[in-house]
């Protein structure tokens, strides 16, 4: 039945770079990103941009869902297939999406020092 949620988030790439360069890098990466995301982003020359875009994507999805209690960062994995980003969900994120009959559409971008993500939630079958 049309659009059911919209989320937008921006993330400072330099902020993520400072975290990656600092003593909190490992705890941050372990808490926020799945192993697959870390493997993909960590081998890129623009790792901070890749991490920032995924951070923004996860924040945007949480906003689109209305910040359901119990959702965890690793419940939301950002993947790419054929160039288009999408979510592979688990845990509370998956439970909420299935209970509400939703599917998510994700757009990512970055320029200069900013990464941004937009998430549109739509009822399945629309």
UniProtKB/Swiss-Prot annotation:
Pfam families: ACPS (PF01648). Its cofactor is Mg(2+). It is found in: Cytoplasm. Mg(2+) binds at residues 9, 59. It catalyses: apo-[ACP] + CoA = holo-[ACP] + adenosine 3',5'-bisphosphate + H(+). GO terms for cellular component: cytoplasm. One of its GO terms (biological process) is fatty acid biosynthetic process. Transfers the 4'-phosphopantetheine moiety from coenzyme A to a Ser of acyl-carrier-protein. This is Holo-[acyl-carrier-protein] synthase. It comes from Myxococcus xanthus (strain DK1622). The lineage of its organism: Bacteria, Pseudomonadati, Myxococcota, Myxococcia, Myxococcales.
């Amino acid at each position: 039945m049309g659009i059911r949620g919209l989320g937008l988030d921006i993330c400072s790439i330099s902020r993520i770079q400072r975290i990656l360069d600092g003593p909190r890098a490992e705890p941050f990466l372990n808490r926020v990103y799945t192993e697959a995301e870390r493997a993909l982003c960590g081998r890129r020359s623009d790792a901070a941009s890749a991490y920032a875009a995924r951070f923004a994507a996860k924040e945007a999805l949480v906003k689109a869902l209305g910040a359901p209690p119990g959702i965890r960062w690793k419940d939301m994995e950002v993947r790419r297939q054929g160039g288009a980003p999408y979510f592979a969900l688990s845990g509370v994120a998956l439970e909420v999406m299935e209970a509400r009959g939703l599917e998510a559409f994700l757009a990512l971008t970055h320029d200069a020092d900013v990464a941004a993500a937009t998430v549109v939630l739509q009822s399945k079958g629309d």
